[in-house]
Amino acid sequence: MPDFSMSNLAVAFSITLAAGLFTVLGSGLVMFSKTPNPRVLSFGLAFAGGAMVYVSLTEIFSKSSEAFAEIYDKDHAFAAATMAFLAGMGGIALIDRLVPNPHETLDAQDPSFQESKRRHIARVGMMAAFAITAHNFPEGLATFFATLENPAVGMPLALAIAIHNIPEGISIAAPVYFATRSRKKTVWACLLSGLAEPLGAALGYLVLQPFLSPAVFGSVFGVIAGVMVFLALDELLPAAKRYSDGHETVYGLTTGMAVIAVSLVLFHF
């Protein structure tokens, strides 16, 4: 397996950090902006979902199979990659079951939300931050390892996760800001949650680095592919559909796939 230089590690970590910091952008939309156009939001979420699905199934899963092929024959390598992919989906589904993502439960326009006591709203914000932070750890690990092995794969994935992090920031910022009216506390809540991604990357690398091998890389990339596909299908696409009854979701989905497909072709040249 490749021996990564400090510059490789720095680039991968920086891209992971940048993707995580997009959570803070969500706080800015809550504090300073008007309500975003639902159709634009729908398109953007679907775009991110399409990008994540495409890059996961065409590039990241292939990297898993290629890594396993260094120790198994082609058929067994594909089977091992498939098992890792399914394990990734199962693992993130379990996390989602134990710590549900609060996207669907937070709506600043809901009357019951507006009328709740500030202490209760603050507690909702803390729960949202905790839940999203738990989901951010595997996302950070995915971005870091994908970029570390091949920036042509990692950068499109980081872009998709960055877009995905904006509504997550809104989910945290809305209850915190309405409860405290403090921009500082709101930004800090989003920042701490976003930093879970580079933290997940750093911890994951420190734990796995002594054991890096074709089997480990194959397992990591297979799990990453499964996690990303699950997140796209479970969070991004349903959220995109909720914001629009038109064709914005399918347009965003196909555009995201097309843009990532073209970018990957260009990277290969």
From Swiss-Prot:
It is found in: Cell inner membrane. Keywords: Cell inner membrane, Cell membrane, Ion transport, Iron, Membrane, Metal-binding, Transmembrane, Transmembrane helix, Transport, Zinc, Zinc transport. Pfam families: Zip. The chain crosses the membrane at residues 12-32, 41-61, 75-95, 126-146, 152-172, 187-207, 211-231, 249-269. It comes from the Bacteria. GO terms for molecular function: metal ion binding; zinc ion transmembrane transporter activity. GO terms for biological process: zinc ion transmembrane transport. Zn(2+) binds at residues 139, 164, 168. It catalyses: Zn(2+)(in) = Zn(2+)(out). It is a multi-pass membrane protein. Fe(2+) binds at residues 136, 139, 165, 168, 197. Its main location: membrane. GO terms for cellular component: membrane; plasma membrane. PANTHER family: ZINC TRANSPORTER ZUPT, ZINC/IRON TRANSPORTER. Mediates zinc uptake. May also transport other divalent cations. Belongs to the ZIP transporter (TC 2.A.5) family. ZupT subfamily. This is Zinc transporter ZupT. It comes from Neisseria meningitidis serogroup B (strain ATCC BAA-335 / MC58).
